[in-house]
Design a protein with these regions (language model features):
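N-terminal Rossmann-like NAD(P)+-binding subdomain of aldehyde/semialdehyde dehydrogenases
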Residues: 1-113
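Residues at or immediately preceding the N-termini of alpha-helices
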Residues: 17, 36, 54, 241, ...
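ALDH superfamily catalytic-core signature
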Residues: 11, 174, 207-350, 413, ...
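Rossmann-like NAD(P) dinucleotide-binding subdomain of oxidoreductase/dehydrogenase enzymes
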Residues: 104-243, 281, 370
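Residue-level signal for inorganic ion chemistry
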Residues: 39, 85, 148, 179, ...
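Conserved C-terminal structural/oligomerization subdomain of aldehyde/semialdehyde dehydrogenase
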Residues: 2-7, 11, 26, 34-40, ...
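Structural signal for hydrophobic packing residues in well-ordered secondary-structure cores
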Residues: 28, 47-50, 54, 89-96, ...
Length: 484
């Protein structure tokens, strides 16, 4: 099913999606558990799709964004998808093995046994976003396929060229009972969220996640929500500020900051503020001597998001903010074919500024200063728990203090974003930044049912322990086990 006409009635849209889901569920039952060979074949087909269509993927991303660095697209959406799939293929047999579990005394001595089996759930729904449309579809499939599941995918309507290509790719490589792509706008997304999947993965904005979770709850569908938030950067006094600025701005300008894990704001020692700005200007100039017509500098996805981000800058200016635009060639961005916004630092923003209230999701970086690191912890803990937190410093005690006294989905020390690329680490949020996780073995387990299996001892005395009559001997045995 490539598309669902938006003009169709809500019931008709839902029915057409449900028909595909029913066929997938029937195939899952009729064909029985997927063998290791079949799971690896599913993964191999996805890897082949990415490799064989890499040029088309880059072209589709460029078309949807208006301008997106081809090498960056290859790194994030192709290489960044092949890696998780290959990792799952190499390790799935180990993940699939039953896990022995311990038994209470004396059952183990009497021959009882217990283990956990990881069983495929069935059909996993995947709602993927526009910022990395291929990566955030294919990377979850690593865990989905490794666990022996089928998938139904709803890509974002904000990237129509990518969605169309994705539908074509999957249609050519998979039967619809294995993988199906459902394209369309909000009405399709709403109908998709209401389906009785065996698990639903949503990546996107928290405001939309509330609707998705509410819809899924009607069928008690478990959800994994990968959201975002305002991921802070805490810079220690003993840091190499120029290097810190370079790493932060590299992360902030990747995809023009349109990353759920992008550093949202930075907190630096007050005496290091000017040095950080100078370092940021230096690295941006090195990376992007020009920006307006530079294919390496990514556009903002659409007019709405462009207006939203420029609105943050204008709001900061109107409220007296010290706004520093990093524009090495002094280009005029008021007249341009693409929605590009130069990297912008807002020094010492005030709490009434929108840039400190909303997730930025763009190349704007508020910079707060502090006297003591305790101020940074208080500030982070006064906000919603973020998807990522970044600490720069060499003081192991201070690092431990930051990690112990803040809560975030994940942490990268002495860089930004990088923890998401470690396949053996879980990726997920906490609280408003998300729930659940995937990647590597954690993805395999998220998309599996951990089934407890117990084999009873053949010893008759085990069964006799629980049967009436409850004489004094049995009473004493029970009481002997109730102790501090």
């Amino acid at each position: 099913m490539e598309s669902t006409p938006e003009t169709s009635s809500t019931d008709a849209i839902s029915d057409s999606i449900r028909a595909i889901l029913d066929r997938q569920k029937k195939a899952h039952i009729d064909e029985g558990p997927a063998s290791v060979k079949r799971r690896k074949d599913w993964i191999d087909r996805s890897i082949a799709l990415l490799v064989d269509n890499k040029d088309e993927i880059v072209d589709a991303l460029t078309s949807d964004f208006g301008n997106r660095a081809p090498v960056a697209s290859l790194m994030t959406d192709v290489m960044g998808s092949v890696g998780p799939l290959d990792h799952a293929k190499k390790h799935m047999e180990k993940w699939m093995r039953p896990e022995k579990r311990k038994l209470q005394f004396p059952l183990g001595l009497l021959g009882a046994k217990a283990h956990v089996e990881y069983q495929a759930l069935g059909t996993i729904g995947i709602i993927s976003p526009w910022n990395f449309p291929f990566n955030l579809t294919f990377a979850p499939l690593a865990g989905v396929f490794a666990a022996g599941n089928r998938a139904m995918i709803k890509p974002s309507e904000f990237t129509p060229a990518c969605s169309e290509l994705m539908a074509k790719m999957f249609r050519e490589a998979y039967d619809e009972t294995e993988v199906a792509v459902i394209t369309g706008g909000p009405a399709v997304g709403e109908a998709f969220s209401k389906q009785p999947f065996d698990h639903l993965l949503f990546t996107g904005a928290g405001s939309i996640a509330k609707h998705v979770m509410r819809a899924a709850s009607e069928n008690l569908v478990p959800v994994t929500l990968e959201l975002g938030g305002k991921s802070p950067v805490i810079v220690s006094r003993d840091s190499d500020i120029e290097d810190v600025a370079a790493r932060v701005m590299t992360g902030k300008t990747l995809n023009a900051g349109q990353i759920c894990l992008a550093p949202d704001y930075v907190m630096v020692p007050e005496e290091k503020a000017d040095e950080f700005v100078a370092g940021a200007q230096k690295i941006v100039t090195k990376m992007f001597p020009t920006m307006k017509d530079n294919p390496d500098y990514t556009s903002i996805i659409n007019d709405r998001h462009y207006d939203r981000i420029t609105g943050y800058i204008e709001d900061a200016k109107a409220k007296g903010g010290d706004v520093i635009e990093i524009n090495p060639a002094n280009e005029d961005f008021s007249q341009q074919p693409y929605n590009k916004i130069p990297p912008t630092i807002i020094k010492n923003p005030t709490e009434d500024m929108k840039v400190l209230q909303d997730e930025i999701f763009g190349p704007v970086l508020p910079m707060k200063t502090y006297k003591d690191v305790s101020e940074t912890l208080d500030y982070v803990n006064s906000k919603d728990r973020p998807l990522g937190l970044y600490y720069f410093g060499q003081d192991s005690e201070e690092e431990r203090r930051v990690l112990d006294n803040t809560t975030s989905g994940g942490v990268t020390v002495n860089d930004v974003i990088m923890h998401v690329s470690m396949e053996d680490l879980p990726f997920g949020g906490v609280g408003p930044s998300g729930m659940g996780s995937y990647h590597g073995i954690d993805g395999f387990r998220t998309f599996s049912h951990a089934k407890a299996v117990y084999h009873q001892s053949k010893a008759k005395m085990v069964a006799e322990m629980f049967r009436p009559p409850y004489d004094d001997k049995k009473r004493k045995r029970v009481l002997s086990m109730i102790k501090k």
